[in-house]
């Protein structure tokens, strides 16, 4: 991949919430998961676990319990990015949040590069959402869902937003 391709994926990534009725094939899903697992992690602990959901009934149940994930009623795929707390960085257990966030962003960028649309829907730290998602996906108590990522072939093409804000950049000191 060229530098421009990476920067293009970053610049063109948008949250896609409407999807075509077209399944995402297993090889493409595996590419997304490989991208997630290529993320950096504190102490290289790689605490992430991914739950891949393609069954319509389960996708609908996830949409039922998450007020901002209603696009799962339409999406053909959900990747729930979770942390196995047994594999967190020793002495600083909350690094899993950064680790799994990096994995999630890699998935979102890979989706863009593969011609897919995706959107990150936060779960943690909303414990009501954590417990509902944990119940639906039968997660063990040592596993915490950080988010659910709806994925599919986009049925919308929202404009790319320029998010550059120079006033938020501070050189050397604040």
Language model features by range: what are they?
Residues 1-174:
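Acidic, surface-exposed loops and disordered segments
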């Amino acid at each position: 991949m060229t530098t421009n391709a990476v920067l293009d994926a970053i610049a063109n990534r948008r949250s896609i919430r409407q999807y075509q009725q077209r399944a995402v094939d297993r090889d493409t899903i595996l590419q997304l998961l490989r991208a997630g697992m290529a993320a950096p992690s504190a102490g290289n602990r790689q605490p992430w676990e991914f739950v891949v959901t393609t069954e319509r009934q389960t996708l609908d149940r996830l949409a039922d319990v998450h007020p901002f994930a209603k696009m799962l009623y339409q999406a053909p795929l959900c990747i729930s990015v979770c942390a196995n707390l047994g594999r967190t960085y020793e002495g600083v257990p909350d690094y899993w949040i950064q680790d799994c966030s990096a994995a999630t962003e890699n998935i979102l960028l890979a989706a863009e590069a593969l011609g897919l649309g995706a959107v990150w829907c936060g779960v943690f730290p909303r414990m009501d959402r954590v417990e509902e998602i944990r119940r639906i996906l039968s997660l063990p108590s040592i596993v915490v869902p950080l988010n659910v990522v709806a994925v599919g072939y986009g049925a919308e093409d929202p404009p790319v937003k320029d998010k550059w804000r120079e006033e938020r950049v501070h050189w050397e000191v604040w």
